[in-house]
Amino acid sequence: MKTLRESLLLFPLILCADLSYQDRAEKLFHDLEVVREIDQAINKQLPYLFTDFGMVGYFTMPSARMPKAGRFGFGFAKAPPYDIWSLSAQLFDHLETVGSYSIYRGILEWNFGHLGFGDDADRSASAKLGLLRREDGFPYLPNFSLGWIDFLGSKRFNSFFVAATQEFIWADVEATLGWGCGRIKGFYGGLAWSPWNWLTFAAEYDANNYKKHSWEHPLGRKVRSRINVGAQARLWNLFTVSVHSLRGEKVATSASIHYDLGKTEGLFPKVYDPPVYQTEPAGRLRTHEELAQELAVAFKEQGFDLYSAYLTPQGKGLDSLWLKVINVRYREEDTVRTRIEHLLAYQIPDTISHVTAVVEADGVPVHEYRFRLVDLMRYRNGILSNAEFQVIAPLHNASSSPSSYESAHLYQRRRPICIFTFRPRLLTFFGSSTGKFKAQTGFTLSAEGYPFDLCYYFIQGSFTLFSQIQNLRSVDILNPSRIINVRTDGLLYHQAHSFHLDQAYLQRSWHLGQGWFTRIAAGYFETAYGGVAAETLLYPVHSHWAIGFEGAVVWKRNYYGLGFTNKIRKITPNGLTHVPFTGFQYFVDFYYDYKPLNLDFRFRVGQFLARDKGIRLEGGRTFLSGLRLGLWWTFTNAKDMINNHRYYDKGISLTMPLDLFMNQSSRTRIGTSLAAWLRDCGARAYTGKELYQTIFWERYNQHPLFY
């Protein structure tokens, strides 16, 4: 009876508590919904519109807006009387860059259009600098930018502009007011409405000075209306198509693709990457040799190769273990570290007090990890976090293997003697007098390895299947190079035979200690040159800088066969001649890596291949995806003239991880480079695998604990 009475008394309390719990739960979900709505309001943005030449704007006029860093685009526009190809890259949140190629339809190029080049064309580079963006935390202020259109080369469409764009998120509307000088003359404006995220209607006031601009196409000068109206549609948040009126005379269309290559994790998930190691440790009863074999198998499963293992007595029944490991799969140092930490934490028995793991790449001991067993156990048990473990056990400069008199050599594996690689090859040639674009396709077959573990060798041959370059001239008709032709005769090598031995060289590298590295190389370094080279580099662990010294003696290869020549081509006012030549190039290299923005710089000072002296400036940014976009500009004392202006070698480069297109991780990188002109000033011969590039990419960490 008493129990029933107590239950009846407790029932109201339980009921009230339950109702209170439900109220709190409902309030929690309500608060979470409010937070979600606030986040959506903060992150909501209007769709981006792109001009015919590839810059964020409307149809012909740029706006002040720009996407986040890492977004790349490629497009084509038919804007009568022009056909425009464009390539855009958002290097930083506040810097948009665009390269475009405009074809004057119906206007024959006046110098060599009749030779096959066809219609006149112009290359241009444009940039926009964002001074104030809505994403900077000023949602009620307009975006404000200034920009330069076609600021390099012949500058046929050159303009400077300033623009302010206000976004009315609540109404899905944006409005722009801008002013420009050059081809854009005076004030302009734009208005866009996006009733749906995939469709935008827009109108603009076109301020281009079509009538009086000197480089304007004759068929593009007539203007009936300066109001251009049209629409842009986005498909799958990837493709953009646009239709709009132009000058009140024509209808222009464009199509482009835009993708965030900077942050992508790849087209496929890395389903074939093994999980981090979590297996029972080797016990005390196993012999040391069995331990080494277990480690070799475990490292292999994780994507590493174990090449050496030494055991050194430390006293009191404890030993230290020294390992040499080669990373064959992963492209970021923190991934390598995490997997090695897990493997050692689960595999090392309690009879070993310390473990040293040296990581080697391309025959160079790059750095090492030093772990105490007590720290590995604490990490395994979740007492130490990744960040804490990095503080306790940071990277160190690589050490040499222990003495055989003091240590037991448990395991040794030789590097592979021969690895074959088959790849397709595409060579492109732009701006030939007989055509705007020419190509040569084929394949390459290469072999590389470490015979007897003494040095590295690389041999590559190429075979041409299809070529459009057999009738191309190797001399610029309008602007022939007046210095020795160290590069401008390169076309002749590809016209020689269907099969060619591109490279065949030996290289040996050493780590001298305390962050000093050196290498020597000899052989056929590239299609055009062979010789001997040496390099020394100071690049300590945890350093943002490095300094290197390099030099090479190279000889010119014959256009046919494997022989060399001591003559090189030179074009003089009296005609073509050949002069004695032995190539000497030497440089002092300064490197700097700015971690907060993943920027890297190189300043190369010395003598280049054409005996010109000067400096080559290089810079690049690596995005979260591993894609790197770089620029270079060379200033030397060579007097190379193009269109009566002194030319300095410059261009862009692009490299990216191959695993962006794979379902497993890979260290391999692919890339290309494009110079503004193929000239001889600021040229250098390839001399083998550079030390800095090998070490930089092996130590590369997208999210370092310390800057």
Question: At which residue positions do the language-model features occur?
Answer:
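Transmembrane beta-barrel domains of Gram-negative outer membranes and organellar outer membranes
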Residues: D18-L152, F168-W170, P195-L199, E204, ...
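Sec-dependent signal peptide recognition
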Residues: K2-L10, W545
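Hydrophobic h-region of N-terminal signal peptides that target proteins for export
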Residues: L10-D18
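Gram-negative and organellar
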Residues: V271-P275, V374-Y379, I383-E388, P394-N397, ...
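Residue-level detector of the transmembrane beta-barrel scaffold of outer-membrane proteins
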Residues: G73-G75, S86, E96-V98, S126, ...
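Short loop/turn motifs that connect adjacent beta-strands in outer-membrane beta-barrel proteins
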Residues: A64-A69, L132-P142, I169-V173, W198, ...
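Flexible, glycine-rich linker and terminal segments associated
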Residues: L19-I42, H213-W215, Q232-L311, G317, ...
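Outer-membrane beta-barrel translocator/channel fold
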Residues: Y104-S126, G130, E135-G137, G147-F151, ...
